[in-house]
Design a protein with these regions (language model features):
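Conserved DEDDh/DEDDy metal-dependent 3′-5′ exonuclease domain
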Residues: 1-16, 22, 166-276
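Acidic, Mg2+-coordinating catalytic module of metal-dependent nucleases/exonucleases
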Residues: 1-58, 66, 75, 246, ...
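Generic, well-ordered alpha-helical scaffold segments in large soluble proteins
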Residues: 22, 75, 86, 101, ...
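Short His-Asn-centered micro-motif
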Residues: 43, 127-129, 197-200
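N-terminal accessory regions of nucleic-acid-interacting proteins
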Residues: 59-124
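Conserved RNase H-like, two-metal-ion catalytic cores of nucleic-acid enzymes
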Residues: 109-191
Length: 319
């Protein structure tokens, strides 16, 4: 890296002059979109240069290499309707996405979905975490920007036909949130039954972080880690796919596609970033709103995350 910097240094004066000329010009540079638009970061002018690209295009094809997307674009292929399926090297899941959009069809692999649901062990737990990532570490054993748990929501179903219970935790912002989080989570999760999460890497990673810092809880937390199951798998594998999912298996796309009556739009806190920033402002002492009301809003948001998982599983159970 050092040698690369030394090699680039003599070019800086010319680059500065070139950039100044661009800034001072009255005309927008005539440069087509390309991989450079997001290399190394998304350009602030994407909203201008990408105006001719529709909201849903070849750039939304799931897991398609960026260069291949631009190969299609450079051939004049922009929408999914433009793709010649006989001349493409898309993989089966990508083809499924394109065909679903073009034909307006839903794909359901009943056998795979039933294998997944029949393998679930009751009682079932539906779990979701919220985290903060302080730039300056505030607690022992933490790193700059490390994601630290401060809240969870947990829906519990003892049997396939039993009433759903709900439990939750939201830390006191004046204290290290992790010990209280750990102790209540261990109590609420019991010792048996599958724990469903959506995108297993996140919750598993946070639990492993806790095990590293608090080894005295390693046995109980490791038991929870071993019981995790990923509700995202049926959608990631395209066992259940609708055009509304637009190639994504994010819960933000899956939920409105499967359970349109459930929505975050009416909540004061609508997404995880807002929840994180809100709690972090409480931790930093800069929060100026109604603390009790906002804590209730945080609980309401996180509760919907796990209730959404309950409703998604219901859909899978009825295919």
């Amino acid at each position: 890296m050092y040698d690369q910097v030394l090699e680039f240094l003599p070019r800086i004066p010319n680059e500065v002059r070139r950039l100044k000329n661009v800034i001072e010009s009255s005309e927008i540079p005539n440069v087509d979109i390309g991989p450079h638009c997001s290399d190394p970061y998304d350009c602030d002018f994407k909203g201008t240069c990408w105006k001719h690209i529709p909201d849903y295009s070849v750039f939304n094809i799931s897991r398609l290499n960026k260069d291949k997307k631009f190969d299609l674009y450079n051939q004049g292929v922009i929408t999914l309707d433009d793709i010649d399926l006989s001349q493409t090297d898309l993989n089966p899941n990508q083809l499924l996405q394109v065909q679903s959009e073009v034909n307006g069809t839903t794909h359901i692999d009943i056998e795979e979905i039933r294998n997944f649901t029949n393998g679930l062990i009751y009682p079932l737990y539906f779990l979701d975490f919220e985290t903060i990532g302080p730039a300056v570490p505030k607690y022992n054993g933490s790193r700059p920007y490390q994601q630290l748990v401060f809240q969870y929501s947990l829906h519990i179903q003892e049997t396939l036909t039993s009433v759903i219970e709900h439990r939750e935790y939201l830390a006191d912002p004046s204290q290290d949130p992790r010990i209280g989080f750990i102790e209540q989570l261990i109590e609420d999760c019991g010792t048996s039954g599958d724990i469903l999460v959506y995108n297993i890497g996140f919750e598993r990673g946070k639990l492993n972080d806790l095990i590293e810092v608090f080894p005295e809880y390693s046995k109980e937390l490791s038991g929870i880690v071993n019981r995790l199951k990923d509700l995202m798998i049926p959608f990631q594998q395209k066992w259940y796919y609708t055009p509304e999912m637009r190639g994504s298996y994010s819960i933000k796309y899956v939920l409105p596609a499967l359970v349109p009556e459930l929505s975050y739009n009416d909540l004061p806190i609508k997404e995880g970033g807002t929840a994180s920033n809100t709690f972090l402002s409480m931790v930093n002492g800069s929060f100026a709103g109604d603390v009790e009301e906002t804590r209730n809003q945080l609980l309401e948001y996180c509760k919907l995350d796990t209730f959404a998982m309950v409703k998604i599983l219901e859909k899978l159970l009825h295919v």
